[in-house]
């Protein structure tokens, strides 16, 4: 039996790849769209370069309990691909390292987004990850799809 899970997601967003890519590497944008419903996010550190690191926490709005995680950027191909790791804070007792890979491809109506997350600890149900990512991707779409020129 596997001790980790892999999930894969696919969306098409009505936004250019450049804007979606930026939303993953801009601290204010990342903290706005990544936390799933019911959580706020805080980026404590973000050095978006290969080998650079980030630290972030999610806070449950109801209970005010926070959990932190962070990792390193493994691959950054502007407007096309990025890959980063995530390790949960030790207090959560969720061992191992997750790896998230995002591939962006321009299509006639926007950008195709493929996300693969590997190494999800067995204690986290895959369906909970899918739900969280679906909520996050809805928030990402709301951030990157509007064409605000001013």
Regions flagged by a language model, labelled:
Residues 20, 30, 54, 73, ...:
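Hydrophobic pocket/interface hotspot
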Residues 14, 76-78, 107-109:
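Structural motif
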Residues 1-40:
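Hydrophobic ligand-binding cavity/cleft-lining segments
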Residues 43, 142-150:
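Short, highly charged C-terminal tails/helix-capping segments
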Residues 25, 137-145:
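Short amphipathic alpha-helical signal-transduction/dimerization elements
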